[in-house]
Amino acid sequence: MGFRIMNRNISYVFPNISTFNRNGRGGLHKRYKIAVDHGCSLIEVPADFVKNKTEVQLTGKKLGSVLSAQDIQKLYESGTPSKNIKYILHTEPQVSRRNGKGASCTPQLQWNNQKWVRDFANMAISISKIFGVPPAGIEIHPGGRHNTYSDIVRSIITIRELFKNSFNTIPFVVLENRTGQIVSNGEQIHDFWQVLLFKNKSLSKDVGIVLDIQQLYTVTKNDFLKQLNFIPHESVKGLHIHCKHRTPSVENKIPWAKVFAWIGKIKHKIFLNPEVHHHSQAIDTISFCNEMMKKHPTTTSQDCEKHATRNPGH
């Protein structure tokens, strides 16, 4: 039974739960059915590099390798249940991977290398082609300090152009804040946004941040609310809602009531991804979000907090 969405400006993403990835990465058919059953208008689909022992065996590639078109055929189920399906490709997050034999690998995101960026985009395009329908959006991650904010903005432009050339449509692109990467706290999100506006203000409608609340809390702890309030509301296109990839609770250290009060001040349409690993937890997390939004409905624009003005660091 589907959920009644509590806010017309909110869409839900059905997350990439573990059951979809038992022997490969699955496809759109099963994800779509479950998403529709639970009132989710968007679907999360993995688009990482080779990430585990099973994928090493299926592709014959090393951990952290970019997928070829042939690899993609081995990992994904083809086709789509609907030409109107909306899915988000969740791309390589630059995390440590293990092959089951003690070896590990952490692929490096190279936004400063335009050849690498094209290879990255072409892999995402090949995944989309096996489905026969382009993604609504693409989620990317900041990477290490060898990248700059300008590198990321330039890469986003390249990715969008390549998708336009392949599908004659352009996906939205969101950047997730990640612990240990160059965009992890509120000040860095603020500075990245300022660079994006300076480089190409027209991007701001379809490019922005997907704010992972748990990641922000992990990085900031006692400064969490201060850092949250550095983030321009207009930069946020979506949020990941979870507590260490489990269903949140008001008993968590994360001050969820204040988080949802902050979310309520966002005036444009956004998506919420209950980024957990199990089906039941996804449903419980959507219920949690609906309950929190009942208590913290959208406020008027004059109530919005003003953000500190800072000079971009990149």
Give names to the regions the model predicted:
Residues P171-S202:
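Basic- and aromatic-lined ligand-binding clefts that recognize polyanionic substrates
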Residues M1-R118, S204-D206, D303-G313:
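N-terminal pre-domain/capping segments
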Residues I152-Q181:
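Hydrophobic, well-structured mid-protein blocks that either form specific transmembrane helices
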Residues G2-S11, K30-V36, T80-P81, N113-K129, ...:
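Histidine-acidic metal/acid-base catalytic patches
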Residues P15-R22, P46-V50, E92-Q94, G143-R145, ...:
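Active-site beta-loop-alpha junctions enriched in small/polar residues
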Residues A124-N147, N177:
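Active-site groove signature of glycoside hydrolases
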Residues I43-E44, A136-I138, V173, L239, ...:
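Hydrophobic residues within beta-strands of alpha/beta enzymes
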